[in-house]
């Protein structure tokens, strides 16, 4: 009896693992690896580049609702929208279907992590307005997928160098990548 069970298990296992090579979804592993690598790498980079200049302190909120003429909020919405869009696109490529809600969950999880990092930074703080803008951007993608089954409103970004960064490089950036992120006068 024991030999028959072992033989049956081996025969069954062999049939399971002898499926054609194309039955393994390599795209799934590539997608998950890319998301983990990009997410982890970008969070570590931001921790070392953006937050290293400030002390860590207890979690606190920061009301920036009236700052920067809402350009910061537009940037949060833009980022959330495009993260949701790209994750949904990657999911479609890996699985041949897309559940845009998963893109929203990923985008909100990633951007909330950034807001939490802000919340523990002496130079910043967790902004409920930023959090709401993130939700609005991700929600814009989801709403269009549910209502139109396609994207009708596509948030876009443009940048032209301003003269203000040279006046206040500590606030508006010293080099192109910093200026791109910080100089709202040029966006």
Write out the residue ranges for each language-model feature.
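Hydrophobic alpha-helical membrane segments
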Residues: 19-187
